[in-house]
Amino acid sequence: MLIIAGTLTACGDNKAVTPLASVSLLPEYQDRLDIYKTVTLSADLSQLSTNQKKMLSLLIEASDIIDDLFWQQAFGQDKTSFLASINDDKVREFARINYGPWDRLNGDKAFLTNTTAKSPGAQFYPADMSKAEFEKATFDDKNGLYSLVMRNENGELSTIAFSEAYSDEINRIAVILEKAATFADNKEFANYLNIRATALRNDDFQASDLAWMDMKNNPIDIVIGPIETYEDQLFGYRAGFESYVLIKDMSWSEKLSKYADFLPELQRGLPVSEKYKAEIPGSDADLNAYDVIYYAGHSNAGGKTIAINLPNDEQVQLEKGTRRLQLKNAMRAKFDAIMTPIAETLIVPEQRKNVTFTAFFANTMFHEVAHGLGIKNTINDKGTVRQSLKEHASALEEGKADVLGLYMIRQLLAKNVISEGTLEDYYTTFLTGIFRSVRFGASSAHGKANMVRFNYFAEHGAFSRDEQGLYSVNVDKMTIAIDSLSELILMLQGNGDYDGVDKLVAKNGVINPNLAKDLASLEAAKIPVDITFKQGKKVLGLN
């Protein structure tokens, strides 16, 4: 937290905020202010009815409140006062992108004066709580997704549900969702909005997740609520608020629908012993492409998501599967602004042609599909994989999704189910994608997963680096490395092997000197690290 913070109540209610003294950029951060390229999030809404446009406007209003909630979870200060304390426009925008004074793509290092280190537990836990104290304590909803940990009047650890801690904001969001439902032409979508509103009020999201899985034909969609646990870097238990407002691309979605049918067969063929692949993925899963028109909260903080795989609820996944949403317009923006120039800088000339948008789209898509494969519950009664691996669960799951995604592409290419591109395209584009993603920093779940995979592949000769710092992919060795790393990760997950994962991350989750040098060359070439958005009702022409 900022040393100069105003007074706040324990549950994030910022009614007693005092003005903040002005802060300024640390000198060493001057060169990082331009690492985000601004992209306009627009879409053709001409085919939407008047009611659908009214509904979109309301969904964006609900998302704005979600955005404020995530500021409270991530930073804990009053957003308006904090941003007003920054006089420089570019620095203020950088702080807005990062949802606070810490650089999300540089290990959460502070970039403003008078700023202390970011707590690994963000605002989900008391600032004075140690990890050991938490683990020894006994209290209700200790590992809960949807509650804050705080101290009671006796100084003991206890929890308060999100619906109570943020009651005003939650109720406002719920009312807006219910109003939006009255404008929905699609009955299933109207039902989902109403059930989601109820879920926000009572912190029980399973029924709304099931309702969301039943939606197949609605052209408008929204992902909203406390969903991912990446912001909780202390334990990975508690979920951050986020929202995406989406327009379905019907023609692209039709192309993708066939892949979900292969999930059971691909699960059976995983390169690991039978006991680690006994779970049967839900057969009601679907795969669709969308243009995203609004990001809010966690999804908008720092690096931007370009694909979604939800719900996270293991029971819903086993019963219904998951929905994989490919955010096509955001994906294209990243490919053009970042992937192409990275390939021209770090890939050998003869393989640059293998870096294609088709492969980038597929790698991203099958990463999300692969979240539905593998194992959700340990084989030795340690509970779910997520519970047993604690703060390492997210990083290992991201690594699993990457390597199993490549495994799936290889299998579907061999069956001619995928007819575009070659294995060399997908592998070379994947390697280029590691360079893109690792610039997000090695401290995040995705960053650790990137480094574990990069260093593992390097050890197994999947790619080589020449004296000029240019990389080339060895297709045969990459294939072998993908299968062996897949087996290793699935076994660590199935065994709930926290210590084994800890050792793997400690050994391979680091950036080596050569890679650091290569990443510096991308900075020297002024290639953006990620994108940020010009978005909202005005951009879309909505009232």
Please tell me what each predicted stretch does.
Residues 1-5:
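Sec-dependent N-terminal signal peptides
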Residues 7-10:
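C-terminal motif of bacterial Sec signal peptides marking the signal peptidase cleavage site
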Residues 12-14:
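Bacterial signal peptide processing site
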Residues 19-192:
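N-terminal helix-rich structural modules
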Residues 29-41, 46-55, 140-387, 391-395, ...:
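Fold-level signature of zinc-dependent metallopeptidase catalytic domains
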Residues 78, 212, 443-446:
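Structured alpha-helical bundle/scaffold domains in large eukaryotic membrane-trafficking regulators
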Residues 406-503, 507:
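Long, well-structured alpha-helical subdomains associated
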Residues 489-543:
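Extended, compositionally biased alpha-helical segments that mediate assembly or anchoring
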